[in-house]
A protein has these predicted regions:
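Two-component/phosphorelay signaling modules centered on CheY-like receiver
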Residues: 16-34
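Acidic, metal-coordinating helix/loop segments flanking the phosphotransfer/catalytic sites
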Residues: 35-52
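Alpha4 helix (beta4-alpha4-beta5 surface) of REC/receiver domains from two-component response regulators
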Residues: 66, 87-102, 115
Length: 121
């Protein structure tokens, strides 16, 4: 397995079970992981500089796409995986327009996660 210890992956999801399972899978693969329960929590952590971001689409304070839109407006360019229970063509179109790397239905597979964090960038 490739060395992923230099990758910092930020995960933003309001569901503790999802955060815990994604963190576990990525840490076992050797990635460093930072987790956040909301988009606001992520934005408040000025120190974080992840290599990639895994976002839930449906969160109480801000959707995943709203967070991506804000990051792009601030000039932040990083790879983003959007995970959702409702993967519709309009959502995929909006995500593509914002430069989201991947849109996947929950739960993403271990292979999908590992390929994403190992990707370019």
């Amino acid at each position: 397995m490739a060395d992923r210890s230099d990758h910092l992956v930020a995960i933003v999801d309001d569901d503790d079970a999802v955060l815990d399972s994604l963190r576990f899978l990525l840490e076992v693969a050797g990635a460093r992981v930072a987790t956040y329960h909301s988009a606001s929590d992520y934005l408040a952590d000025a120190e974080v500089r992840p290599d990639c971001l895994i976002l839930d689409q449906h969160m109480p304070d801000m959707t995943g796409l709203e967070l991506v839109e804000r990051l792009r407006a601030d000039g932040v360019q990083l790879r983003v995986m959007l995970i959702t229970g409702l993967n519709s063509p309009p959502l995929r179109g909006q995500a593509a327009a914002l430069g989201v790397t991947k849109v996947l239905e929950k739960p993403p597979t271990e292979q999908e996660l590992l390929e994403f964090i190992a990707g370019p960038g």
